[in-house]
Amino acid sequence: MKITRHQERVWALQILYSLDISSELNIQKARKTCREFKYKKVLDKKRYYFEDIVEGVINSRQDLDSIINKYAIDWDVERMACIDRNILRIALYEIESGLPVGVAIDEAVEIAKDFGDSNSPKFINGILAKSIED
């Protein structure tokens, strides 16, 4: 089974969402959750991209949230929909890690269409677009 980067981003979002709503965004819980996730998906033991995203977002969360707060006018990251804030964190982490900006934004918007509410794609696109202008 070929696993796409898009699928791995979705898996990362699902894991980050579950950790975020349970207030367990810490690296130990993330690693345990990734191991359990791989077992449930019957994936082999190699390291997957979604694990890099999950760990990277958790390790960089304060910096990522500062960026989000800077560009989300009149919104605090903690008051945003959990899905939206984690899509933004993933996209910003990937941009910081060298993924082309256009790819990161396109992926974030597509994932927002599938998992967010009707306003999520526009909201996410706007914040990401503002953040790269600087």
Swiss-Prot record:
Biological process according to GO: DNA-templated transcription termination; transcription antitermination
Assigned protein family: Belongs to the NusB family.
Gene: nusB
Function: Involved in transcription antitermination. Required for transcription of ribosomal RNA (rRNA) genes. Binds specifically to the boxA antiterminator sequence of the ribosomal RNA (rrn) operons.
Domain of life where this protein originates: Bacteria
InterPro entries the UniProt entry points to: NusB-like_sf, NusB_fam, NusB_RsmB_TIM44
Name of the protein: Transcription antitermination protein NusB
Signal peptide start-end: none
Keyword annotations from UniProtKB, A to Z: RNA-binding, Transcription, Transcription antitermination, Transcription regulation
GO MF assignments: RNA binding
Cellular component per GO, a single term: cytosol
